[in-house]
Amino acid sequence: MTTGSLLAYLESEGYDCYAASVGPISSAWDRACELYAQLTGTTVDYGAAHSAAHNHDRYGKTYAQPLFSGWGPEKRIHLFGHSFGGATVRLFTQIACEGIQEEIDASPTDVSPFFRGGMDSWIYSVTTLAAPHNGTTMDGAMREDDATGAIYLPLTTLAGAIGNLPVVNGMYDFQLSQFGLTTLPGSYAFNVARLSEMLNFTTSRDHAGYDLSLRGAYDLNCQIKAQPGIYYFSYAACATQADGKGNWVPISSMETIFKAPSFLIGRKAEPYTTSFGLEINAEWRQNDGLVNTI
């Protein structure tokens, strides 16, 4: 947060860099679809099968112009994803390369080219920075029912609610129009229908809260594999130190806002194994304030 903009630094070194804007609390799937639309200058297509399964609109925002011209085999891209952006670019690469047969079957005549795949020669590398590839154990912010994978994330509920307040939606867009949770800047719309839309979003598995959970990350990892011919790099971060009592605590220079969740992740706890076979032990305590270093 305090070391500057990677985008600006790379541009100063002579690289052509572009930043996409995707839903901050949307699922990795929805974010990948939004990234594709921005790269191609098209309308966001979340997929007929996916949208039906999660009870939201199939189409989203339309981008009149691509982020840059000429994306393709002759102009391959290097993808960078920070934090949850790591899951986003990994899933994006998986879909772009192999496609999604379920989406092709659901709408064979108008399926998005994204879901047809075949773009493996369009991507040169994938780099993730402090990404929770295996989910996060930040139990203080999210609570997981391991048997069902149900996630209760106060942040998503809060965002769905305050995103409709005039003082907020005039300044910040949570980009949840597919769920009907975006209103005109400065306007206010909250009624029974809007409450239903909020509940549909927060109780589904189609949001960042689920994908950031241990179970959600496991589900994503079952879908994603490294693609031949594409380079993958992953950089982890650690801003904690051992306190001699079995805990990993924040270093003094950690941003204050991250210290509370860092304590929650780094506290000593009994090892356990999830219902899907993931062993959570002392190696999970090191963290960067939000994301486990492991």
Question: What is each residue range found by the language model?
Answer:
Residues 94, 100-294:
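Helical cap/lid subdomain of alpha/beta-hydrolase-fold lipid enzymes
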Residues 1-131, 135-150:
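N-terminal non-catalytic accessory region
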